[in-house]
């Protein structure tokens, strides 16, 4: 089996919503900084991380933030050729997770791989044999959403503590949330 471990990272509200109308339903600066740090941080300065996302997630990232800096951006889509024409040089486009993993295996400079959405990409990653952990920010409030994080099967994923992840409640404005880590058994 491939050595590439998939880490999923998402923020979801009480109803497991992760998006509405192509945007995040909340504005949480500290939570967004956590996402950036987690998906960018490397232990060796010669390495970078990869972020894997679906085409709709790519489209939802504001132009000024695309591609996500200091990370190898990988977009998954059924329309590889048309998407390749519309992304900046250096952004990789593949038809599926297995092709992306094969590409990552061929690069010695990639330290960690992060799956950043959307729903169908999360679902595929959670059931993939290379799935390692889910880093889920659990927002303690409901929002209207049209996009949802897949249900986490507690028989397959167990809540774990990680030293560098704060376990205490986080608060921004009138929204509280927890950083959680689920490890695939």
Curated annotation (Swiss-Prot):
GO terms for cellular component: mitochondrion. Signal peptide: none annotated. It catalyses: (6S)-5,6,7,8-tetrahydrofolate + NADP(+) = 7,8-dihydrofolate + NADPH + H(+). It comes from the Eukaryota. One of its GO terms (molecular function) is NADP binding. Activated by dithiothreitol and p-chloromercuribenzoate. Inhibited by trimethoprim, methotrexate, sodium tetrathionate and hydroxymercuribenzoate. It holds the Pfam family DHFR_1. NADP(+) binds at residues 11, 17-23, 55-57, 77-79, 117-124. Keywords: NADP, One-carbon metabolism, Oxidoreductase. GO terms for biological process: dihydrofolate metabolic process; folic acid metabolic process; one-carbon metabolic process; tetrahydrofolate biosynthetic process. Residues 5-184 form the DHFR domain. InterPro entries: DHFR (IPR012259), DHFR-like_dom_sf (IPR024072), DHFR_CS (IPR017925), DHFR_dom (IPR001796). Substrate binds at residues 31-36, 71. Its EC number is 1.5.1.3. Disulfide bonds: none annotated. Pathway: Cofactor biosynthesis; tetrahydrofolate biosynthesis; 5,6,7,8-tetrahydrofolate from 7,8-dihydrofolate: step 1/1. It is an enzyme of class 1 (oxidoreductase). Belongs to the dihydrofolate reductase family. PANTHER family: DIHYDROFOLATE REDUCTASE. Key enzyme in folate metabolism. Catalyzes an essential reaction for de novo glycine and purine synthesis, and for DNA precursor synthesis. This is Dihydrofolate reductase. The lineage of its organism: Eukaryota, Metazoa, Ecdysozoa, Arthropoda, Hexapoda.
